[in-house]
Structures are given as C-alpha cells and as structure tokens.
C-alpha cells in the first residue's frame, strides 16, 4: 500500500511539471488602442468626473426681421409691455448688425404736427434701444407722416395699424 501511495504521488507530481498549452488567439475581440474612441474611453476611465464642454448655439435667425410697435393717437411716449420687452430682447440677442427705426403716422394729409409725432416716436424707440445696450452706431432713424400704410381704412380701427414705429433688425 505504501508503494501504491508513492506511485500515485510520483504520477501527480509528474503531471504538474509539464507546462500548460498557450491559448489560441482568434482576433475576434480585438480593440484598436490608438483609435479616437479608445482614447476617449481611456480618458473617461482616468478622469471620470471631468465635465465635458457642450457647445451652445443660437437658433438660426432670418437675415431680416421687422417688429411694429403701435401707439395711440398723438402719443409719443414708449411704455413697452412685458410681452413687448421679451419680444424685443429675444430679437436683440445675439447683437444684430444693424437696426432701422421708422416712425410712421396715420393721416393722408400730413400737417406739420404729424411729422413731429413720427420723429419723436422714432426717437423714443431709439433711446429705449440705447438704454438696452445697443450701440448708437448700429441704429438708423427715419420718420415719415405719410408712408408705408399697413391699412388704407379711413376709419379708426384701420388707422390704428398706421400709428406705429417699425423696428427692422438686420443680421447680415
């Protein structure tokens, strides 16, 4: 029995002394080390909490937009509503290349007072734009008592559309 145990131990030791076979490589699971994706994955493993930069883009804007601000009869003071302020601020950023401000009135036969009203309305919008941070060199003012009618109606509801200042925003 003793010999049998000795022979079993000798066979066991002889089996352990032979080196294992090398693994066979198929190439199915190869990962290129220098590819951009692999480098980005490695960077994220090394610096996991590093924030990634995200690009912020302004929405595409048309090259020209016009907004009309309407005034009551013979009123020249510009008191914008919160909706008008939000609309104008949205149009003013990013900063436009140029802004044309055109003051208009509603009479077909312009008395001298209508020219003055159109001018003062345009200046009120001009001053408001400057107070909002727009450079004066980017703004052009014009005014005309009889021009560019939005409505040819001689009655009050149609004439309201003609008492306005057009703000034309040019992007190119």
Swiss-Prot record:
Q: Where is the OmpA-like domain?
A: 58-172
Q: Which domain of life is it from?
A: Bacteria
Q: Which UniProt keywords apply?
A: Cell outer membrane, Lipoprotein, Membrane, Palmitate, Signal, Virulence
User: Which residues are connected by disulfide bridges in this protein?
Assistant: none
The record's function comment reads: The VirB system could be required for the establishment of the replication niche in the host.
Where is this protein found? Cell outer membrane
Native source organism of the sequence: Brucella suis biovar 1 (strain 1330)
Principal localization reads: membrane
Q: What is this protein called?
A: Type IV secretion system putative outer membrane lipoprotein BRA0058/BS1330_II0058
């Amino acid at each position: 029995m003793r010999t049998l145990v000795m022979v079993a131990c000798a066979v066991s030791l002889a089996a352990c002394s032979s080196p294992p076979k090398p693994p066979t490589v198929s190439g199915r699971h190869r990962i290129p080390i220098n590819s951009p994706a692999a480098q980005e994955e490695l960077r994220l493993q090394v610096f996991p909490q590093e924030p990634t930069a995200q690009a912020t883009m302004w929405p595409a804007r048309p090259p020209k937009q016009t907004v009309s601000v309407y005034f009551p009869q013979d009123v020249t003071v510009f008191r914008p509503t919160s909706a008008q302020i939000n609309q104008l601020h949205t149009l003013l950023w990013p900063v436009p290349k140029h802004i044309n401000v055109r003051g208009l009135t509603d009479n077909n036969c312009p008395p001298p007072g209508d020219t003055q009203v159109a001018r003062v309305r345009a200046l009120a919008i001009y001053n408001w734009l400057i107070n909002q941070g727009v450079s004066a060199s980017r703004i052009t003012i014009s005014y005309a008592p009889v021009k560019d009618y939005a409505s040819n109606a001689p009655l009050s509801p149609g004439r309201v559309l003609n008492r306005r200042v057009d703000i034309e925003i040019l992007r190119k």
